[in-house]
Amino acid sequence: MFHQKQFRNYCRCHAINNFLGYKAIPYEQFDKYCNEFDKLNNMPLISKNNCYFYNNGGNNNIFGYVLEKVKYICKLETFYSDKNIISKIGHCDTIDGFIIFNNHHTWCIRKVNRKFHLIDSMKWMITPLNNEKLSQYLRGCKGIITIKEISH
């Protein structure tokens, strides 16, 4: 399974690539997408330099923008520090993965063959998560973006 390791402050890029399962976005291209996204949103070019991702709900964030650029059409939904996350996201069968974030880092959980795997660019190994471990893990996260593929 693809596992891109940490390089500089590109954890958001690693999270997207790890979720997709291949190096879809080189670092230089990720920087360009950040700059484009900031200009579209009249922001002072903060996505690339400050690792900010401007979350206005749904797909209107750097993750939705980049996933659309690589033709991965999906629906994103964001939750913050929510102990009831599992009841709110519903059945995980419809979810393809998660982008997990806190103030300092971003990583992903990816579904492969109907099983979830924690893929963190700062960790040495990929960690499989059964439904119980997934539920426990998500309850402890500061921020979660669910990913549901519409078409690819």
Segments predicted by a language model, with ranges:
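Active-site nucleophile-adjacent alpha helix/oxyanion-hole segment immediately C-terminal to the catalytic cysteine
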Residues: 1-53
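Generic preference for well-ordered alpha-helical elements
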Residues: 8, 12-13, 27, 60, ...
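Amphipathic alpha-helical interaction motifs in eukaryotic regulatory proteins
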Residues: 12, 16-17, 34, 38, ...
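Alpha-helical bundle protein-protein interaction modules that mediate dimerization/oligomerization
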Residues: 103-106, 112, 116, 125
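Noncatalytic regulatory segments and standalone regulatory/sensor domains
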Residues: 119-152
